[in-house]
């Protein structure tokens, strides 16, 4: 037996061992809490309960909010659940009394259901609950709540005063107590119970009259008082007590007794004495069929003498005559008593109170009065009290327990410490937000600058230069400028004489002399370059360098051609020049926007050692880079980075290789073909090696940034391959062929059945929606065909089903092809929310409340599973059968809307949350709204999506908000809406979630929305859905689209 008990305890069924000690609650108990409370019988569990109780006591004393009733309500509910056995440990009576005494002066709680619940709990502890309800009615507490009249009527019904109970119900209905439908329902149930009892009573009386049965002794009979005016315990008499006193208890007389007409009927009186019984009429002597059974044998036996002495006044029971008393005879001897003997002292026997505390008598003065009287006396005492306490008495005796001054000081210190830490965290969070805003602003400026530069580079025109001599490179005569930015290039010397000294060679020759001077580095002198350029060139045309000439950009192919035609001597001279490292310059300083210098010259492109000279590189140089494969990689990474909307800052790659005066180079140095020479100076090779290292590091950073993008196709594909094998699921199938062409009227094989495409419903960027029907059925089903071979929707559905278990019933199947996939859902006769917006004249207040309520519950489940949807738009939501079949009550109110597109969803359990929220489609729709910068979590994007959808349904336009200094509010006014208070609370709550958990926010909003679903609401809702179903049903939409030339819709 002991082993079985231990096994039950191990299995978590401790409550099975102590069912009889658990006090039942009308609203039931939480099973997990009950098992935990019963398992915490040890000292550790008891200590944990005491700590939680201490926390509630502290919260009551130091509560600074505007709803103190909430703390008491949570404290009492926690006590009920964690002390299932009741008793002195729970101290429920004192707890309820202190709560009522503390809140009795708050008139705002008089019609609060929580405050009325406290009074009802107090009524269960009172001697006369009816007096308490009369007192509540006189004070106006709970008179507008249905629960007040229901509980009051139940007390009268328990006392079988059905008339008064019915009067109480009628009074509540006349006052229209809320909720009125619940009160009326309880009244009807009460009337049915009374009617049933009346019919049963009539039937029992008829049965007793027709078939009188011998009464039986009742066991465990009730001793509860009955009656309306006088309370008297019922007297149940059975067996021989109901017969006439003259009859025998053993056998009945065979001969009936004659009834004398002039003889009075005597009634048995149990309170009459023995003398009065002799006056009763004696029965007529009749012959006995059998000897009677003696009634009192102990009185018929002759008692024997116990002693020869009888006390005076005693007489034998069988002799009514008086007997003379015999005087007592004293003994004729005297017992001997020793003189030295002492009387033995008896030790008093005292029972241990810990053992026999149940049977100990109650001490005088321990009798406690009625709780209602104590509450009333406390209220009168508070009204009459005029003393002023000079210490914090309210904090010492606020709760049930008592706090010392040291404990109060400690709690005050902890509270201040907590506030200081929260302020520090808030300050640090604000600083992070400001830094993030600055970074985003810098990114936007950089992107704008790059866009302008790309436009200028894309529109740049290139002209072919005429060559007079195939061995020479000439300068184009026509000026070419675009958007006010001068075009730059690397210039080759015009002289065919290999011994002619170019300006760049002059600079290089002067550099050894400059090393010995006091100057730290030499500066390029343009005038000197112009003087040297005036020397005549042999074998070529004279070039006037007094004035700088316009330049032209050579294409890569042209440069390669000219390099082949130039003589080897000229190439050798040119390869001795060290090309400028633009990558080293760009990555060697932080991102600072620099204005291009229009007075720059192409000669600076060859002066690599002149670090103080400003250089400006144009973006078109990427198009003529020496390494086309590296260029494609860089462009690909740039595209991925733009897709992720996240710019990587290369501040960690700061390399101090040049002088302090460093500016961004705009020269097209990559266009020069002479940098490919294999013979170069050692410094040139070292710089080239360092540039290659920097390019590799930058490429790795760009790749990591692309992988971190949650919407990157390659990243999603790698994630699906590493996490799970989709082919192992029965709902997933793979076809090793291209995706079939989806056209209206054609058949497509989906799983074991063939479907016929009826109509194209919606066309989006990367997927399309079709209405299809099985070949053997006319029921329309919606499928989603995507051009991406990544079944991300199916993955999200699997994760939701895995993490939510039975709380998620959305089923879908997927078929993957080589170049796409198709997902079809198990819903029939459904349409998107986009169709509903196109028929806004049928959208009523009830339909909007139903849709938003469904959306709140769905998104709450997504966030519990750590998944962000990111695209809560009309095109991604479908309306289920609850809309088209409003009288089908099998489907609940929270099954009307479902999500069918998870293209923008992010699984935060396996994906990093360090990304820009602007990648969500909801953020793209609300672009320009300042509230987006206030999102501290990806989950908040879904809250804004719900708010935008509600705004779209109510005002027919997207969300517009503003900051009033304290809260985010709508630009539109909700005062003209039906149930404007509900919508005002909804938008204020969902727009100002701040750092709170979105799961709790969504749960609270769903509960508040669900409170509107009463009988009247359902009546209006079903009427509106019936009208709407005729318009947006799939059959009606197919008919309308067949009449239109377009057919498919465009996304919202």
Swiss-Prot record:
The modification N6-acetyllysine is found at residue 243. Residues 206-256, 272-327, 361-381, 496-552 are annotated as: Disordered. Disruption phenotype: Mice die in utero. ATP binds at residues 762-770, 784. A motif (Nuclear localization signal) lies at residues 105-112. Kinase activity stimulated by CENPE. The active site is at residue 871. Residues 508-520 have a biased composition (Polar residues). GO terms for molecular function: ATP binding; protein serine kinase activity; protein serine/threonine kinase activity. Residues 56-219 form the BUB1 N-terminal domain. GO terms for biological process: apoptotic process; cell division; metaphase/anaphase transition of mitotic cell cycle; mitotic spindle assembly checkpoint signaling; protein localization to chromosome, centromeric region. A motif (D-box) lies at residues 217-225. GO terms for cellular component: ciliary basal body; cytoplasm; cytosol; kinetochore; mitotic checkpoint complex; outer kinetochore; perinuclear region of cytoplasm; spindle. Residues 756-1040 form the Protein kinase domain. Residues 146-179 are annotated as: Necessary for interaction with KNL1. It is linked to Defects in Bub1b are involved in the development of lung and intestinal adenocarcinomas after exposure to a carcinogen. Interacts with CENPE. Interacts with PLK1. Part of a complex containing BUB3, CDC20 and BUB1B. Interacts with anaphase-promoting complex/cyclosome (APC/C). Interacts with KNL1. Interacts with KAT2B. Interacts with RIPK3. Interacts with the closed conformation form of MAD2L1. Interacts with CDC20. Belongs to the protein kinase superfamily. Ser/Thr protein kinase family. BUB1 subfamily. Essential component of the mitotic checkpoint. Required for normal mitosis progression and tumor suppression. The mitotic checkpoint delays anaphase until all chromosomes are properly attached to the mitotic spindle. One of its checkpoint functions is to inhibit the activity of the anaphase-promoting complex/cyclosome (APC/C) by blocking the binding of CDC20 to APC/C, independently of its kinase activity. The other is to monitor kinetochore activities that depend on the kinetochore motor CENPE. Required for kinetochore localization of CENPE. This is Mitotic checkpoint serine/threonine-protein kinase BUB1 beta. It comes from Mus musculus.
